[in-house]
Amino acid sequence: MPRLSRKDIEHISERVYAAYRKLPEVANKKILRISPELMLKLVGLKIEHCRLSQHGNIVGVTCSSGHLVRVFDFENEKVYFCLDGTTVLVDKELHDDESQRGRYNFTVMHELSHQVLRKLFPGEYDEVTYRTYHDCQLDWRRPISNWSEWQANTLASALLMPKDLIHQGMYYCGLEGRIEILNRKYRSREYAGFSNLADFLGVSKTALAIRMKYLGLIGENHLRYPDIMLEVVRDKEDDAIGR
């Protein structure tokens, strides 16, 4: 499997995005956000929805050749779905939950990205024909422990959130340039604009923060730990007292 850099993946996403803009559905029109369904059409894939696990920990599956996938019916009985190599299978409960639209869109693009990378590097991906996306695999930490998942995550992020659409959305959402500190408790105005931007682009706040951080549009990301600012102030006060 090739170990692509972020720069390599950005170049791939730019090529795919250029082709997307030429589709008749969006050609010569103002694009506000990426449609995962239209992106699937571009790369010759289709989508189906099934219940993929009993506890919701598996949200997407795809493969490059025929493969039987275990799914669950409405009575929680195991059945099998036959993937044909051109299908992205996404969890039905995730699809039906409108509050999870951003997570759903990213899942679709993650599975699509596996297929795009396989098509670009067929000899490298022949040994790995089956992909399952777990929530716990949305991991961007270093060192990279799973290059296949990291590359799919990175390409999905770049495809779903092109730089020009983020800048355009920032303007529409009243964000004036780079967000120096993303913090919902202590920088509420910027955070409100950021939240509106995530909704506008159809993505989760987590995915958007990671993408904007990479693009240099966010300085400090306190999305998960908003009280970190208070802790920093306390540390500085303690240091001052100790001197």
Residue ranges of model-derived segments:
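Active-site hotspot residues in diverse enzymes, especially metal/ion-binding acidic/histidine motifs
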Residues: 1-243
